[in-house]
Every structure is written in structure tokens, then in C-alpha cells.
UniProtKB/Swiss-Prot annotation:
Keyword Ribonucleoprotein: no
Keyword flag Nucleus: yes
Principal location: nucleus
Protein name per Swiss-Prot or TrEMBL: U11/U12 small nuclear ribonucleoprotein 25 kDa protein
Species of provenance: Bos taurus
Localization per record: Nucleus
CDD domains in the record: Ubl_SNRNP25 (cd17058)
Quaternary state and interactors: Component of the U11/U12 snRNPs that are part of the U12-type spliceosome.
InterPro entries in alphabetical order: SNRNP25, SNRNP25_ubiquitin, Ubiquitin-like_domsf
Entry-linked Pfam families: Ubiquitin_4
């Protein structure tokens, strides 16, 4: 049934309810896709609500990676506290440093790109 639906046909076979709801929210304009670029060039399309904060984006990235690892059979642990302690998310050269600040306040819109950049050590 999901495979034949034109709105949901892009979803993977082992789809979760969360992914279905995100896709529907995208279609109704209640959510946006943020393209997260990893340092190896891989782009992860992450869905967040329109008024999402930086923290919401970080949680969505974690969920996206977790689901992808489960589907591909890779059961490797990622220390997200290490990731967020070591890397900044950036958009158009601006670091997304405040977790409570809305993505909209950083100028991030639907289909905009966000990338990881290594934090500089402070002495």
C-alpha cells in the first residue's frame, strides 16, 4: 500500500511511523528537509519541522544515522556527545552554536545545506 502511494513511494521498505509522519508533514509544508553534508561528501537529507531548533536538527541527524545503520546491518556505536563536542554544524559559514536558537533565525530554509566543521581547540 505504501509502495503504491505517490506521496510515500520514496520511503524505504522497513519504514517507521515517524518517517511516514515526516513525509506527510513535508507534503503539507509543515516540515523541511535540511541537507546535512558529512566531511566525506555524503549528503544526508534530514527532515525537521518548520520551527525546529538546532537541538531538534541534531536529534534528527542522530535518528537518521541510527535508522540507516539498523537497515544496513551496521551495529556500531556512535558517541554523539563526542561528535557534538568535536564538531560544529555550519550553514553558509555561520556556526550553529546555540542549541535553543531556531534554524529559521540562522537563515536555514527548506533544502538548505548544513555541514560539519571541526571545532578549534580553545586554550
Amino acid at each position: 500500500m505504501v509502495v503504491q502511494d505517490p506521496l510515500l513511494c520514496d520511503l524505504p521498505i522497513q519504514v517507521t511511523l515517524e518517517e511516514v509522519n515526516s513525509q506527510i508533514a513535508l507534503e503539507y509544508g509543515q516540515a523541511m528537509t535540511v541537507r546535512v553534508c558529512k566531511m566525506d561528501g555524503e549528503v544526508m537529507p534530514v527532515v525537521v519541522v518548520q520551527n525546529a531548533t538546532v537541538l531538534d536538527l541534531k536529534k534528527a541527524i542522530q535518528r537518521y544515522v541510527q535508522l540507516r545503520q539498523e537497515r544496513e546491518g551496521g551495529i556500531q556505536h556512535i558517541s554523539w556527545s563526542y561528535v557534538w563536542r568535536t564538531y560544529h554544524l555550519t550553514s553558509a559559514g555561520e556556526k550553529l552554536t546555540e542549541d535553543r536558537k531556531k534554524l529559521r533565525d540562522y537563515g536555514i530554509r527548506n533544502r538548505d545545506e548544513v555541514s560539519f566543521i571541526k571545532k578549534l581547540r580553545q586554550k
